[in-house]
Design a protein with these regions (language model features):
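A structural "hinge/loop" feature
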Residues: 111-136, 144, 155, 239-248, ...
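Surface-exposed binding/hinge segments that line
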Residues: 208-290, 666
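Extracellular/periplasmic solute-recognition and catalytic clefts
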Residues: 200-206, 220-221, 310-323, 347-414, ...
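Aromatic- and charge-enriched surface segment that lines or borders ligand/interaction sites
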Residues: 157-203, 229-231, 355-358, 419-421, ...
Length: 691
């Protein structure tokens, strides 16, 4: 196989991995909401929201999926910088822009050449909402494209495989600098790998993507000051999408760190007495706690960063402000250093409802996170009336907006766990849910009742049978299944009883933010009551929900499935070995079993073991085999109802974008998902305000 053919194969892999939103399957036509189904908020819902705008399909590349090097920028003498930075240069506080940029800057193309200045006003719900900050900075060596169909260079100048995809070499841009002006080099990647990943105090277990099939560690070595080589025991065809989900904004998944700054907080480098004093002064117990605190760019404004904007204060404050990085590596095609906007300000709101009111009033310049689809009619009305903003609907790669997931390793009540580990019980729950009602009431008629798999048109799509399996509203079938399990006795309120006399039921945890989790949960609870299943709906804040998830304390949860298009890379929700924080609560102790080599935790059932085996095979598989593997996993997933999907293919989960009419270059069509770090894949450093 020659080099060109090999790279074509890699391109195909990426196209398979990220479903193009312009697939042949059109979005379902929204049906009008029935009068009897009230909107989940007090806002009127006179019309159904249109389906999300599909992003155009990207043609398959003829060579590599992303350019091995970015196009050359303007000559150094022709670079321009923002007026506020030019003033600092004039005052002798900053070097000229040509000296701050790398020799070969990242060149970003957008519909318009922008204007400098302005503050991007956004909202957030405080520290528990930090993923919204991570998405904006999208602080990685590479990143996903606007349509999610490919991976593009960012801080890296090139990422190159060998002919067998067992070696990948990352080359950085010569002359790149951290926000404090210090060089950004291969040593910053090596510090992350040698001193964080391989330090058991900081990271007890090595991330699975850095392990070979036999459990040995992937070899990571410095080639020169700008290059680092990763060597795998077998072909690693998913390296690009994997590292696209490793960004320094996410303290759990960085891939580079400012060694020159963080060494003072690391036990391998710092003087012990000095480090002990720093720990004591911070009122912490260990150096590892201090290290993680100082590594967090949203909680430590002194941390040097590579992102377009850098923190000026802590994100626990009422207004969290990020200011332009004078050393950012990007320019536009005219040689203007990016970003265009001077600042990003995140205003704290006590809840999502208050944030939505601010968006409706036109107080936020671009906001998709926490925006409720239920408010779409009001937003459209205000869009026409005030003329302050435009509303875009961004699409996803598939999945579902709010599924019900049972914890199959819950320990506190074995009788309850035994009940919901029965597949027939989960089938009964699924058949009892009236998805068409949820579609109309919660999602304004958009999307479709479905399971959380990839959307039609992808080579990974296993077929309609699995997209819609168990999604029919069949309360009679649900009752028959429950009767067949022996739950025939009922109490005075009509709830079925277990042999012990306890009610057949479970506690369901839902977070009142991001998507429509609570609205969906409330309707599902009412449906399940009709077949005799008692549900204790607990509405919890995100931090507490996640703490309980990690502690194996959740019985069941409502969450979305947003990794259908990136099943084999990043913190995919289709692999129980992923960190529990970012995964779903199928069985936290299954992960423990894998982490300890079977010495602790709970041994997974055969289907889960099969999924794990398939996941491992996919990392080195050819494109056609990857498609087969994806289909096999989706089938196992649905057949066993590990995630009971409700409705998918809507803009509900961070796809309703409110955009100031004066803010230009914001993509009207954008593929959104957590893996893509939306809106970060929309290149926000190119967005600008028209004066």
């Amino acid at each position: 196989m020659n080099r060109k053919t090999t790279l074509r194969l890699l391109s195909m892999i990426l196209i398979l991995a990220f479903v193009l939103t312009g697939c042949s399957q059109p979005a379902p036509t929204p049906a009008p909401a029935p009068p009897a189904a009230p909107a989940p908020t007090t806002a009127p819902a006179p019309t159904a929201a249109p389906a999300p705008t599909a992003a155009p399909a990207a043609p398959a590349p003829t060579t590599a999926p992303a350019p091995t090097a970015a196009p050359a920028g303007a000559p150094a003498s022709k670079y321009n910088d923002a007026p506020i930075l030019a003033e600092q240069v004039k005052a002798g506080k900053l070097p000229p822009v040509g000296e701050r940029l790398p020799q070969n800057p990242l060149v970003l193309y957008a519909p318009e050449i922008g204007q400098y200045g302005g503050v991007w006003h956004r909202g957030f719900l405080g520290p528990s909402d930090r993923n919204g900050l991570i998405r904006v900075v999208n602080d990685g060596l590479v990143r996903f494209s606007i349509d999610g169909a490919s991976v593009e260079m960012k801080y890296a100048e090139s990422v190159t495989p060998n002919a067998t995809f067992t070696e990948w070499t990352i080359k950085l841009r010569k002359g790149s600098k951290w926000s404090d002006g210090q060089p950004f080099t291969a040593d910053d990647i090596m510090f992350w790998y040698n001193d964080v990943v391989n330090n058991k105090d900081l990271m007890p277990s090595v991330p699975s993507w850095l392990l070979n099939k036999d459990g040995s560690k992937v070899k990571v070595e410095k080639v020169d000051d700008l290059s680092v080589k990763f060597t795998f025991g077998a072909a690693m065809t998913l390296f690009l999408p994997e590292i696209a989900q490793k960004d320094a904004g996410d303290k759990n998944y960085p891939m580079f760190l400012p060694a020159h700054y963080l060494k003072q907080f690391h036990a391998s480098y710092a003087n012990k007495a000095d480090l002990d004093k720093l720990v004591a002064d911070a009122k912490l117990k260990t150096w590892t706690e201090l290290f993680y605190l100082r590594q967090d760019q949203f909680d430590n404004p002194d941390l040097p960063v590579m992102s377009a904007w850098m923190a000026t204060n802590r994100y626990s404050e009422q207004i969290f402000t990020m200011r332009r990085n004078p050393y950012y590596v990007g320019v536009d095609k005219a040689g203007n250093q990016l970003p265009y906007m001077d600042e990003v300000q995140f205003k704290f709101f006590a809840d999502a409802a208050a944030l939505n009111l601010a968006a409706i009033a036109g107080e936020l310049d671009e906001q998709e996170r926490q925006i409720s689809l239920a408010n779409y009619p009001v937003l459209k009305e205000e869009e026409a009336k005030s003329g302050k903003y435009k509303i875009y609907l961004w699409s996803s790669t598939g999945g579902d907006e709010a599924g019900i997931i049972f914890n199959l390793t819950y320990k506190k009540d074995p009788e309850l766990t035994a009940m919901w580990t029965q597949l027939d019980f989960r089938k009964a729950v699924s058949y009892a849910i009236n998805r068409p009602e949820i579609q109309q009431s919660v999602f304004l008629g958009t999307g479709e009742p479905r399971m959380g798999i990839i959307k039609k048109g992808s080579p990974w799509y296993p077929g309609d049978e699995w997209a819609y399996k168990y999604t029919e509203f069949k309360p009679d079938e649900a009752n028959a299944l429950l009767d067949g399990l022996g739950y025939t006795k009922r109490d005075s309120e009509g709830y079925r009883l277990l042999p012990s006399g306890k009610r057949v039921g479970f506690e369901l945890s839902a977070v009142p933010a991001l998507g429509a989790y609570v609205d969906v949960a409330q309707l599902a609870v009412a449906d399940l009551k009709k077949v005799g299943i008692w549900v204790d709906l607990q509405i919890r804040e995100r931090d507490l929900h996640f703490q309980m998830r990690e502690a194996n304390d959740l019985q069941a949860e409502v969450w979305n499935q947003d990794s259908a298009g990136t099943m084999f890379s990043g913190s995919t929700k289709f692999d129980i070995r992923m960190p529990i924080y970012g995964n779903l609560t199928y069985g936290p102790l299954f992960k423990t079993w894998y982490d300890t080599g079977g010495k602790d935790g709970v041994e997974p059932p055969a289907p889960w073991k099969q999924i794990v085996t398939l996941q491992d095979e996919a990392k080195s598989a050819a494109p056609d085999r990857q498609a087969q593997i994806a289909q096999e996993i989706f089938k196992l997933w649905v057949d066993n109802l590990y995630d009971i999907g409700t409705v998918g293919l809507t803009a509900a989960d961070q796809g309703v974008a409110v955009v100031n009419v004066k803010l230009h270059n914001v993509p009207e069509s954008l593929t959104k998902d957590w893996a893509l770090r939306t809106p970060g894949n929309g290149k926000p450093e190119t967005w600008f305000f028209v004066k």
